[in-house]
């Protein structure tokens, strides 16, 4: 009887943990998707320093006075398919 109760409690704990983990994962994915929606996707697209970011972690490069900013490709990482 004690063994059955222990197994039942363990099963409930495992199911609760799995459900909580899936909910957190879904929330994290929604946040990541919303971040990707607010970024510049194309290479050499216009970005703003401290404002609209480039997607996939690409840098936003600006002129010396902080104007004429554009997203530049990450050649090493994208060329090797790491990003």
Swiss-Prot record:
Recorded GO MF terms: calcium channel regulator activity; ion channel inhibitor activity; toxin activity
Signal sequence span is: 1-20
Which cysteines share a disulfide bond? 39-55, 47-60, 54-71, 62-69
Tissue distribution of the protein: Expressed by the venom gland.
Q: How is it modified after translation?
A: The toxin with D-Ser (named omega-aga IVC) is 80-90 fold more potent than that with L-Ser (omega-aga IVB) against Cav2.1/CACNA1A (P-type) channels in rat cerebellar Purkinje neurons and is more resistant to proteases. The epimerization is done by the venom peptide isomerase heterodimer.
Source organism's superkingdom? Eukaryota
Q: Name one Pfam family in it.
A: Toxin_9
D-serine (Ser): modified positions:
81
State where the protein is found.
Answer: Secreted
Residue ranges annotated as propeptide in the record: 21-35
Q: Which UniProt keywords are given for this protein, alphabetically ordered?
A: Calcium channel impairing toxin, D-amino acid, Disulfide bond, Ion channel impairing toxin, Knottin, Neurotoxin, Presynaptic neurotoxin, Secreted, Signal, Toxin, Voltage-gated calcium channel impairing toxin
What does UniProt say about this protein's domains? The presence of a 'disulfide through disulfide knot' structurally defines this protein as a knottin.
Listed name of the protein:
Omega-agatoxin-Aa4b
């Amino acid at each position: 009887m004690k063994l059955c109760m222990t197994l039942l409690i363990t099963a409930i704990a495992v199911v609760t943990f799995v459900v909580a983990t899936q909910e957190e994962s879904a929330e994290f994915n929604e946040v990541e998707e919303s971040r990707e929606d607010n970024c510049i996707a194309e290479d050499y697209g216009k970005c703003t320093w401290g404002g609209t970011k480039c997607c996939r972690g690409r840098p936003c490069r600006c002129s010396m006075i902080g104007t004429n900013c554009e997203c530049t490709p990450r050649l090493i990482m994208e060329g090797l398919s790491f990003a």
